[in-house]
Amino acid sequence: SDATINHALTPILKACAYASEMKMIDHAVNARIQDMRIASKISLSDEDNEFDGKYLSKEQMSALLEYYSTCTEPRRKEFLEMFFFAFHACGLRVVDVMTLQWGHVNFEKKELRKIMIKTNKRHVIPLTEPALHILHRWQEKRAGCRYVFNLVKDDLDLDDAEALYKACNNATKCINQSLAVVGEQIGLPFTLSMHVARHSFAVFALNKGLSMSVVSRLLGHGSTDVTEKVYAKFLPETLSAEVARLKEDFASLEIV
């Protein structure tokens, strides 16, 4: 199985990582070797209605950002930029990151308008400054290109379901292989993937006090019911914070 192969590769990959740190082999060579790890297969039809508990805390996100700042492998650095873009673009799904076109981005209004691949519905996402910063970086190297990120070919026909599936499945595999290596190197207790960016945004937003209905709209869920089902375990913390806001007024009504 893929898991057995990955287990067998682990000692080799660790040895290569150590050799790279000791400058015994080139960083780029090591990066290619690390990408031999087999990533989990992703289906475009997978609904994100099952939360596997994998999300990054603020500390883990900071560690990932620190890794990015010192990363010397160009392609891996690009994959990390895509991960951070997905997070900052309100948890944009990986398939929509891949198929994002410059025509979908309005820099003046600071928003993204796109028909989501999964739901086939038009979705408007407000773009934060970090998301815009990443887009500007890619604008410099993707001038004249149809798609924002170089994950699919410019001639990809989005109406060709089979071609879209193959292109996105291959791209997802490449990104997740690279991210899995990064996750291991920063000591994450789970496998890092693009979908973790989506869950991380949702958890951050809920714990910052955004309402379930707002988070649901930002994620592009069909209904609030889906969002509640997926992130129900994070509601108590948010609800406790809401009740805490009543503390001062309630204190004067306390029975003593």
Kindly label every feature range from the protein language model:
Residues 1-35:
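N-terminal DNA-binding recognition helix of tyrosine site-specific recombinases/integrases
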Residues 6, 27-94, 98:
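Basic, Lys/Arg- and aromatic-enriched nucleic-acid-binding interface segment
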Residues 34-35, 99-140:
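Conserved tyrosine-mediated DNA breakage-rejoining catalytic core shared by Y-recombinases
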Residues 70-75, 176-217:
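Short, basic (Lys/Arg/His-rich) helix/loop patches that form interaction surfaces
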Residues 104-111, 189-190, 210-230:
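Short, polar N-cap/turn motifs at the start of nucleic acid-interacting alpha helices
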Residues 116-118, 154-155, 219-245:
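Catalytic-site neighborhood detector that most strongly recognizes the C-terminal catalytic loop/helix
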Residues 126, 138, 233-256:
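DNA/chromatin major-groove-contacting recognition/catalytic segments
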Residues 143, 151-163, 244-256:
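C-terminal secondary-structure termini that scaffold catalytic or DNA-interacting sites
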